[in-house]
Amino acid sequence: MTVFLSFAFLAAILTHIGCSNQRRSPENGGRRYNRIQHGQCAYTFILPEHDGNCRESTTDQYNTNALQRDAPHVEQDFSSQKLQHLEHVMENYTQWLQKIENYIVENMKSEMAQIQQNAVQNHTATMLEIGTSLLSQTAEQTRKLTDVETQVLNQTSRLEIQLLENSLSTYKLEKQLLQQTNEILKIHEKNSLLEHKILEMEGKHKEELDTLKEEKENLQGLVTRQTYIIQELKKQLNRATTNNSVLQKQQLELMDTVHNLVNLCTKEGVLLKGGKKEEVKPFRDCADVYQAGFNKSGIYTIYINNMPEPKKVFCNMDLNGGGWTVIQHREDGSLDFQRGWKEYKMGFGNPSGEYWLGNEFIFAITSQRQYTLRTELMDWEGNRAYSQYDRFHIGNEKQNYRLYLKGHSGTAGKQSSLILHGADFSTKDADNDNCMCKCALMLTGGWWFDACGPSNLNGMFYTAGQNHGKLNGIKWHYFKGPSYSLRSTTMMIRPLDF
């Protein structure tokens, strides 16, 4: 309200001043403008212009508002005194206006400060509200971002772990793949080498097959010729056998006649010149037969001391001076040597082929005088060898026909394949060896086994091509090794003093 009155009073004063000191401006349409500059603010007041003389009546003068009545009175003449008076009044108005201006400035300053403060407060409150809202939203967004970040970190951790596992798995797979690749390369190299060798072998095999075909054709021709020759030889052999049988029969008859004569001479005696009797002795072995003038190899009858009947034996009259009595012979596998104690005691087989003389007869012969043993051996390649012992005899049945030997020599090995220090005879039903394994059952046949030992001439007979790797074959260790089965063997004895 105070501001309004101040403005009204100011307007009245400016109106009066304008009428007294200013002229009407035709461009302003009867209006005048007054501008007041305060700091950066400028105030412009529009004052109205009255028509006619500006001089007012006394009544009008005194009918103005209270502010106008308080102003000093102005004389109505236009004399110089009044002009001076007006100037004085003008100065007073100027001072008054200055006071009003100061008043307005002070009031406006406080009001503007109040308004500005209110505006600042309102703005601050708004800003605080907005800031609070922003803080709330920021906190919420921060929380959400934190949750998202946590999820992202967890997912990232899982992905990193999975990636690490995948990397390890990939590394292992790469390592395995590299190893397999290397192995494949090695196998490929080996295959290439094997293919090359196979090709070479195929070439050699083809050449060998061609050679074998040629040899086969040649052999077939040779076999054909040999078959014809063999047939002719068989015919001749049959004829010779027939003749030989007749001769053997005649020889046997002759031998019987001789034996009868010997027996007759033994009983009655033969008168010699001078009236003395000469005693005729029977053949104790093949040495006696040889010394009696029979120098052809064959079957002869001998009379062994302490034996009830004579025994037919095969005498070898050709080898190393002759006079050999054969006690064992193997040549074709036609006779089974896997027999029991009694059969080995009394002997079996045919003296003209494969046979065993008999332990009882061997004991009886070697008990008559001192004998030498010779073993003749032949392998499947046609190689021959022998072992000879200067002293040979065996014990009786109570002694298990124990073997006694001395003085080894020969070409069938530097060492003896027979046990020199002695060994008992064993068969499949009489185990007398020094082994828990029963050598006669394992190695077959009857023999002087000593913990099986390095020899067995009564073992299983194996044909050519099947005679290798046979521990139970006909073996003589120091001639062909422990698993080579021989082709033929002959054991024969002769008196030491022959």
From Swiss-Prot:
GO BP term, pick one: blood coagulation
Coiled-coil zones: 158-254
Entry annotated with the keyword Ion transport: no
UniProt keyword Transmembrane helix present: no
UniProt xrefs under InterPro entries: FIB_ANG-like, Fibrinogen-like_C, Fibrinogen_a/b/g_C_1, Fibrinogen_a/b/g_C_dom, Fibrinogen_CS
Domain spans labelled Fibrinogen C-terminal: 277-497
MF annotations from Gene Ontology: receptor tyrosine kinase binding
GO cellular-component term (any): collagen-containing extracellular matrix
Residues of this chain annotated as glycosylated in UniProt: N92, N122, N154, N243, N295
Keyword terms: Angiogenesis, Coiled coil, Developmental protein, Differentiation, Disulfide bond, Glycoprotein, Secreted, Signal
Disulfide bonds: C286-C315, C439-C452
Signal sequence, start to end: 1-19
Pfam families xrefs: ANG-1, Fibrinogen_C
Compartments reported by the entry: Secreted
NCBIfam families: GGGWT_bact
Protein name per UniProt: Angiopoietin-1
Organism: Sus scrofa
